[in-house]
């Protein structure tokens, strides 16, 4: 499948509608086939490097799976009978609870994410074909744009995180497609309205685009669609708020409260303005932030050329509002995932605006724009090419560390344990897991945000839950660990996506030293290559 094969589907827009759809389907099938081959190779290599098992590139995916299991049992959190909100998404744990109900395990979120990636590709192809971007374009340009599309939405690497981000990208792009339909005087489809409603439910940062899209629909005279979407969003958020209140949990999940700078500033009563300023500075110096700002500037510049096109200006304004929201409040990276949705939005919006601008340009000028167009899109997509190349190594890295920690807790030392990196240790573990970082433990989260968390609180919580062992990153605890804990081993692993290469194993006063030693000695010989357990105390 060559670039020429992708571009060969071009034809005059004056052709009949059914012919257009046939050509679109052919092009979409070609680009989907390319994506499928790339993703299949990625998956096979990742499984091979992870000891023949499906292991996601981030341990966070298993937090959602643990929450999904508790949802099926009538709870919410990672431990039976204890409520917490470690999930960064409102709806994602419920979606994968359905796949957990049929015992799909990790394949459940992977299938949802892969389907979302494929649907996003189709949505973008339909949108770009419909707006005429490919008209009179050479096959090399069409092919290059199509291949770049695969990576600018991170359709190869992102599903392997096992998280909600691929679904978020789909909802973002589909919402934009609904705005593009409104710009042509058509009401958004039911699917496009559903995508808009899902935005804040999939990821909280989706609220920025959701609000901007609602305003844009009103300005584009699609008030009925805007009212319906707004009512559904309000109902869903109210239901979620009522659920959290009933469980005694905060409205925002622990992951947001502990990670977002501006939220942390609000809870700690420090200057929120300073937190936003810090985020703006980060956006200027962060490679992902720089790419986002460049795409935002491209959208703004193209919109200026289209200043007589009211619908285009309205949509550009909505996109820039979402971009600005992420620049001011959003996060970047964390293995190439936090910013993908807004990078994809800005890129697709820019291509759509360029398509509206082209008929107003001299043919030579339009041709001259092709090179900078591809250069900027390629520059924006490159980190996700790198992510695709790194994904098998990242999957192996999680297998080498968190997967082995989970094995130790479930198979070798079947007692309550404490960790600071929740996920595989908690997933399908019948014993209590204390999260010393606070995502899955409300007392820890509250103590950290109150500024009263240290060795004494760690010791008290461990004693309260009869925790016998702790597996932690020492550097995450600058105040140290309780003096009563004894370091008994260190797990040495390579460093790719894990937060630290060495995991310290501590024995608490409640543990039986002989039992701990037996478990460690039985565990050590079972570790995969390039992973070692140094037993310090016997």
Question: Which residues does each PLM region occupy?
Answer:
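Membrane-proximal envelope and lipid/glycan-remodeling enzymes
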Residues: 6-538
């Amino acid at each position: 499948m060559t670039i020429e094969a992708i571009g060969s589907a071009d034809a005059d827009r004056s052709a009949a509608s059914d012919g257009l759809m046939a050509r679109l389907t052919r092009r979409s099938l070609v680009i989907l086939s390319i994506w499928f081959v790339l993703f299949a190779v990625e998956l096979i290599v990742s499984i091979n490097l992870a000891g023949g098992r499906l292991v996601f590139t981030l341990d966070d995916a298993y937090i959602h799976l643990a929450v999904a299991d508790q949802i099926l049992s009538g709870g919410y959190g990672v431990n039976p009978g204890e409520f917490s909100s470690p999930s960064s998404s409102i709806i994602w744990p419920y979606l994968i609870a359905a796949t957990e109900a049929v015992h799909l395990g990790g394949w459940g979120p992977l299938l949802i994410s892969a389907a979302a990636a494929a649907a996003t590709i189709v949505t973008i192809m339909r949108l770009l074909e419909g707006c005429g971007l490919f008209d009179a374009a050479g096959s090399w340009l069409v092919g290059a744009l199509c291949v770049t599309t695969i990576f600018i939405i991170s359709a190869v690497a992102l599903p392997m995180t096992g998280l909600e981000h691929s679904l978020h990208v789909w909802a973002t792009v589909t919402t934009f497609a609904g705005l593009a339909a409104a710009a042509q005087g058509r009401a958004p489809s039911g699917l496009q309205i559903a995508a808009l409603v899902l935005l804040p439910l999939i990821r909280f940062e989706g609220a920025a685009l959701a609000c901007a899209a609602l305003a844009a629909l009103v300005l584009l005279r699609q008030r009925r669609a805007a009212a319906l979407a707004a009512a559904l969003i309000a109902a869903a958020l109210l239901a979620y708020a009522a659920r959290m209140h009933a469980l005694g949990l905060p409205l925002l999940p622990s992951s947001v409260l502990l990670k977002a700078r501006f939220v942390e500033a609000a809870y700690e009563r420090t200057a929120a303005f300073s937190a936003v300023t810090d985020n703006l500075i980060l956006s200027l110096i962060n490679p992902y932030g720089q790419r986002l700002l460049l795409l935002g500037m491209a959208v703004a510049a193209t919109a200026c050329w289209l200043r007589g096109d009211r619908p285009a200006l309205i949509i550009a304004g909505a996109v820039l509002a979402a971009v600005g929201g992420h620049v001011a409040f959003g996060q970047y990276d964390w293995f190439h995932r936090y910013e993908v949705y807004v990078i994809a939005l800005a890129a697709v919006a820019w291509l759509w605006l360029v398509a509206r601008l082209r008929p107003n340009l001299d043919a030579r000028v339009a041709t001259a724009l092709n090179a900078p167009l591809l250069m900027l899109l390629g520059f924006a997509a490159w980190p996700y090419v790198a992510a695709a190349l790194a994904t098998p190594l990242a999957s192996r890295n999680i297998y080498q560390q968190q997967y082995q920690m989970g094995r130790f807790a479930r198979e070798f030392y079947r007692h309550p344990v404490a960790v600071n990196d929740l996920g595989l240790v908690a997933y399908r573990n019948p014993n209590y897991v204390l999260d010393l970082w606070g995502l899955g433990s409300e007392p820890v989260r509250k103590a950290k945000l109150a500024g009263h968390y240290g060795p004494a609180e760690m010791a008290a919580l461990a004693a309260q839950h009869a925790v016998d062992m702790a597996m932690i990153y020492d550097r995450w605890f600058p105040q140290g660990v309780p003096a009563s804990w004894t370091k008994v081993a260190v797990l040495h692993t390579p460093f790719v996506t894990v937060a630290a290469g060495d995991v310290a194993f501590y024995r608490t006063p409640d543990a039986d030293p002989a039992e701990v030693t037996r478990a460690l000695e039985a565990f050590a010989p079972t570790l995969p290559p390039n992973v070692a357990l140094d037993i310090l105390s016997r």
